[in-house]
Regions:
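A SIS-like phosphosugar-recognition module
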Residues: 1-208
Length: 208
């Protein structure tokens, strides 16, 4: 996994802006959150092995970017980090996809899949990937007469191994730190979390 992380570190530091994956993702997110005022981002992995990334990305981005003050304490005007949610893509088609397709709000969306399956059933995997691609098209082609729309991106990994997983996680980490710069916030502290800890210690003292 460290090899994959290192390769993404090098890519993020040395690749020109027009081909820099983390920067492009950060710029798209900034545009969606600030210019388009899209309040949430939905991560939809179409691979059982990537299911846990939903909660991981949620913690990464919301703890890092869920702030309304700059490092100097001044209040930031406008939006910052989005609310992150999601679920396994195939399962979620029977729960919240209806809301994504026809609800009275909108979300930016990442659909992620692996081209090579992690099992022997290649025929079933082809059906899954075809379904993911079809859903990506369906989610982005909402009725143009409606005032709500989704901003949809797809991420395809050739095969999932430790190196690819490390690179994928590092990609989202770099995206998050770049967003901190764009929003003008420090992504490495969590004052809201610390306040909760402080209040819990006070409440515990009262109980004792």
């Amino acid at each position: 996994r460290q090899i994959g992380i290192r390769s993404m570190d090098v890519h993020g530091a040395a690749t020109p802006a027009e081909d820099n994956m983390a920067l492009l993702m950060a710029l798209m997110t900034y545009y969606n959150a600030v210019t388009q005022a899209i309040p949430t981002h939905c991560f939809l992995p179409y691979d059982e092995r990537l299911r846990v990334l939903v909660s991981w990305i949620q913690q990464l981005e919301m703890e890092s970017l869920g702030k309304n003050r700059a490092p100097d304490g001044s209040r930031i005007k406008g939006r910052t980090g989005q609310g992150i949610w999601g679920g396994h893509g195939n399962e979620s088609q029977h729960s919240f996809y209806q809301w994504l397709r026809e609800g009275t709000s909108c979300s930016s969306i990442d659909l992620c899949w692996c081209e090579k399956p992690g099992h022997r059933h290649a025929d079933l995997h082809r059906v899954l990937i075809a379904n993911a691609k079809a859903q990506a098209e369906a989610l982005v082609t909402r009725d143009p007469a409606e005032p709500y729309f989704n901003a949809v991106s797809t991420l395809a990994v050739d095969e999932l191994n430790a190196g690819r997983l490390g690179a994928l996680m590092a990609l989202y980490e770099h995206k998050t730190t770049m967003l901190g710069t764009l929003f003008g916030i420090n992504p490495f502290d969590q004052p809201g979390v610390e306040l909760g800890k402080k209040l819990s210690r006070s409440a515990e003292a009262d109980i004792l």
